[in-house]
Amino acid sequence: MWPKDLDDFEPLTNDEEGLDTGDALYFAFKGDQLICKTSSGVPEPITADDFRWFDVETSSRHLLGRFRGVGCYALGVEGNLPEGYSLTGLRGILGRTAMETFYLAGRALQTVEWHNTNKFCGRCGAPMSEHPQDRAKLCESCGFIAYPRLSPSIIVLVTKGEEMLLARNAAWPNGMFSTLAGFVEAGESIEQTVHREVMEEVGLRVKNLKYFGSQSWPFPNSLMLGFHAEYDSGDIVCQPGEIAEAKSVSYTHLTLPTKA
């Protein structure tokens, strides 16, 4: 999980004089791909000075806030990139750049995606406009307000003594395992979601839930809530079509992942 307290970042919705300077960070996306500098071998976001040389069309532009005294912006663009820049998915920069950069890029992508999917009112179909105060879209025809979408989800580490439960999603390659995770359904508490997801995916009951922490997870717009839980009862039965295999693994048999 990346830093829980990003003290150096101040969220802002209204632009201020002196924010959009030459060193302002531009998290610019073409589709869901981030435009990065490639000269150093480490993916880095572009700056306002860099962007001046781009011959692209800006479809959306949003102030995110101030990070270490520098303005941060999210942009949606269309067009060709100049030499020395590349398009990279966010998963491609995870582990290869500072976690603060990944956090801000994820925040930017969710903002751009929200803009792209809320151009028209979901209630009456009229065009949406920017809300004058909040980060929101306002329908001036019927008054409907659309805020950025968040999909709460849980991820849980189930333990039994010195062993932990790992599972492989049916869509993943052989050898790729993770802890269990799933989305919160309407009307559920997050604790109920933990119990339901574990039962659905592997047929086990758990107990002694302990909240661990949360993080934004921009794939595409999740708020991930982490838990520890202890095995209570049952035998592993993998959910058909969802879980290919699941097993208990000793901590001592785990190896640390390499950087992407």
Go through the PLM ranges and name each one.
Residues 252-260:
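Conserved small/polar residues in nucleotide/adenosyl-binding loops
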Residues 171-172, 186, 190:
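Glycine-rich phosphate/ribose-binding loops and adjacent secondary-structure elements
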Residues 1-97:
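N-terminal alpha-helical interaction blocks
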Residues 110-155:
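Cys/His-rich short segments
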Residues 180, 194, 198:
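Hydrophobic alpha-helical positions that pack around
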Residues 137-179, 205-206, 229:
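N-terminal strand-loop-strand
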Residues 85-111, 115-118:
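A gly/proline- and charged-residue-enriched helix-loop-helix capping module
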Residues 215-240:
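Active-site-adjacent beta-strand/loop module that shapes the phosphate/pyrophosphate-binding cleft
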